[in-house]
A protein has these predicted regions:
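Structural beta->alpha junctions
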Residues: 2-9, 134-136, 167-176
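A structural signal for hydrophobic secondary-structure junctions
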Residues: 10-160
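A short beta-strand structural signal in non-transmembrane regions
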Residues: 99-100, 161-183
Length: 184
C-alpha cells in the first residue's frame, strides 16, 4: 500500500486501452484519461552537446494530442501558456516558466530527460521544448514538464500503460456524491 502511494511506474496499470473501454462501458457518465507521473533529471546541453545546466524535473504525460481529449481545457493550457505553443507531436514538451528560468531553457532548446523506465532500466530521451507555462499554483509547477502521454510511454517503455487513470464528469463539475459512489 505504501509503495503504491508513491506511484512508481514499475507498479503501472497495464493494458489501459481495455481498462478505459471497460470504464466507459460501465460508467458512461464519466470520461477517462490516463496519466503518467514520473521524475528524473533534466539536462540542458550547450551548442557542443555538453551539459549547460541540469536539475530535477517532475513530469506528467497527459493526453494532449488525441482528438477527443479535454486535457488542454482541464489544465487551462491555452490561458497558462507564456511562450511558444502547445505540443503537436508526442516528443515535444512544455516546461514550467519557473523551471525554464532556473535552468535557462528557451523555447526551441532540447531538454534531455534522464531517468528510469517502467522496468527500472536507465533511459535518456530528448524532448524539444516548444513552450513554457505558468499554472499559477505556487510551488506545484516549480519543476514541472508536460508532455503527451504517448511520448512518456515511449521514453519510459510503457506501451499501453499508465500510472493512473482519471475519471471526469462530462460537465467537468465535481460531484462528491458521485465520486464516493463510484469509489464504493
Amino acid at each position: 500500500k505504501e509503495e503504491s502511494q508513491m506511484l512508481p511506474n514499475d507498479l503501472a496499470l497495464l493494458d489501459i486501452d481495455q481498462i478505459i473501454v471497460d470504464l466507459e462501458k460501465n460508467y458512461p457518465e464519466f470520461f477517462w484519461s490516463p496519466r503518467i507521473s514520473f521524475g528524473g533529471l533534466l539536462d540542458i546541453p550547450d551548442s557542443n552537446g555538453e551539459t549547460k545546466d541540469q536539475g530535477p524535473v517532475v513530469a506528467m504525460g497527459i493526453d494532449l494530442l488525441s482528438n477527443n481529449s479535454r486535457m488542454i481545457e482541464i489544465w487551462k493550457l491555452n490561458n497558462n501558456l507564456i511562450l511558444g505553443r502547445l505540443p503537436q507531436t508526442s516528443n515535444e514538451a512544455l516546461i514550467s516558466q519557473k523551471l525554464a528560468s532556473k535552468l535557462n531553457i528557451s523555447v526551441g532548446d532540447t531538454a534531455t530527460f534522464i531517468g528510469t523506465t517502467m522496468h527500472n532500466a536507465f533511459t535518456t530521451y530528448n524532448f524539444p521544448v516548444v513552450g513554457t507555462f505558468d499554472l499559477r499554483k505556487g510551488q506545484a509547477d516549480k519543476q514541472m514538464m508536460l508532455i503527451d502521454i504517448s511520448g512518456a510511454q515511449l521514453a519510459l517503455d510503457m506501451e499501453n500503460a499508465a500510472s493512473e487513470i482519471f475519471g471526469f464528469t462530462h460537465s467537468l463539475f465535481y460531484d462528491d456524491d458521485k465520486a464516493v459512489n463510484l469509489r464504493n
